[in-house]
Amino acid sequence: IGSNLLTHGKGYISFESKDEKTYLKDLYQENPVKILFPKKLSNEIITAAFVTTSGGIVGGDKLDIIVKTCKKSEVQLYQQAAEKVYKNHKKPSIINISLTSEEGSWLEWLPQETILFENSNYIKKNSLHVNTNGRLMVGEMLFLGRHAMGEINTKGTIREIWEIFFDERLIWLDNFYIDDMDYIVKHPAGLNGANAFA
């Protein structure tokens, strides 16, 4: 794929609280990232859905997602569909997620699964920032191919970096890396034949 076809999608969103109600403060989106707001009942917290309109990412593509809940705001965010990472051509597919929960705020990040296809080269960085009395709930699921279609990905590279900051101080760092996919998937001390993990 020519470099002119590669994408660098961006989505930035922040929320603030006024009179004990949460409001959208800032919104920026750059193709193929879109942010949608489903209808909600008056007593429900604000919900936003992130959409990747390209249907997936390939080698050299990059997505940056930044979410911030300001003091006392409450928000739930999710992905509209599974993220798909296809076979790569030398360059990795990169996703950067930055989530910030300020003092007294509540942020839920509930993505659907990321599906890694055969020979994918995937890098993801999750940076989580929580301030005093802030609350943050985060989920993550990786699928090695589509089990229902009889797929099991045994070739490719995964690198996931997790950073957790409390009051701007790094308290947790995890660097997860797999390059010998077939060995890790089959080994009893690895995934032991499982094609999904969270």
Task: Identify the meaning behind each predicted range.
Residues 1-113, 118:
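N-terminal, charged/glycine-rich beta-strand/loop interface patches
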Residues 3-4, 127-129, 191:
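A general structural signal for short secondary-structure junctions and capping/turn motifs
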Residues 8-12, 45-47, 62-64, 94-96, ...:
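Broad gene-expression machinery/nucleic-acid interaction feature
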